[in-house]
Amino acid sequence: MKRIHAFLFSSLVVILSIVMVGCKDTGKTLTSATGSIYECLVVMNNQALTQDELNAVAHKSLVNEASGYSEPISTTYDLVKAVMAADMPAMPQMEPYFKLTQVNMTYFDDILKPTRNILFVDIDPNKYTQLKVKVANNNWSKPQAVCRIQSPSQEEFVAYWLEKGEGIREWFVNQELKRQTQFYKASTNKDARTILQAQGYDMLIPEDYIIILDTLLGGATTYSLRQPATVASNTRVLWCCNNKGPMRRDIVIYSYPYTNPKTFTAEFLNEKRDAVVSRLVHGSVDGSFMGTEYKVMPPQMRTILVQDSAQAYEIRGLWRIQHGEAMGGPYVSHTRLDHVNGRVVTAETFIYAAGQKKRNALRQAEAILYTLQLPEDK
């Protein structure tokens, strides 16, 4: 079986097309970072865009339904905001990637230095002769992510941001995901981990998740299902849930033999998801079950890198209860090929939080998916 070649989708590769210098943690004692997850401080002097720059922005089509941003763009900060605060894809309500706060360079002081995520945009022809991007962790606090864009002209910055801004945003997202996975290392469900390790896998499922269904080890162990769950004979499933508080979070890991060359297509993976979750998740109305929303917001698939260099297929979409009550929410899945055992492995998280914002909860659960290790990762 040929190994799937990793498609370098990683945002870091995108950013590295411009000179980038990464700064390591100095090891010194640092204060705790301030601010909440997925908040970012933008430090820059806001300037009006020229007509040529406005034309370039219009050509890029940053402001439209597909881009997830609808506010007018007339200044350099507007341009940054159009990318950093664009709406996340496949969410039931509009929620931005990041909540932003902007201050001018002269107002950045010791009070603001511990901020969790900081993006500097410094445009100065007297200091710089070429555009550079520098990233660092834990400059003034911990955990902290800092990105500096240094440009000799506004024109060069605008051109760079239009091409690479999404890569900068993805770098900040990745920093948040990494912080969350570090937290999970100290708090894991040992029983779930033992079940996965028996299959040659590993995953940091938090200890506040309970096991609902396990067919990974053969047979079926059901813990707390309202209705019986069934799975295909060649499919193995581990289903865990955190139902504490007003929000429910679920993790489902399932695997099946790799026999179809069309496996890693959106059509195949979506059909496989429906086949699995419709048998697992039922509503309170007899005959109701979980399905995927295709009409209002079709699932979106892309290739990502996990475990440093392994290829995974990410799908974001909306789930809903079919033939039952009005229930639904967002989900994210990662699918990979287990080369050692010749199986396809999918790890998915879906959440239910009626009337609540879901970005942070989904991102926290999504971080669990990034901890999945297959035999070839070890």
Each predicted region: which residue ranges?
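Short, well-ordered beta-strand elements
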Residues: 144-153, 249-256, 342-352
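Bacterial N-terminal signal peptides that target proteins for export
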Residues: 1-11
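Bacterial signal peptide processing site
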Residues: 24-27
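Long, folded non-catalytic interaction modules
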Residues: 33-164, 169
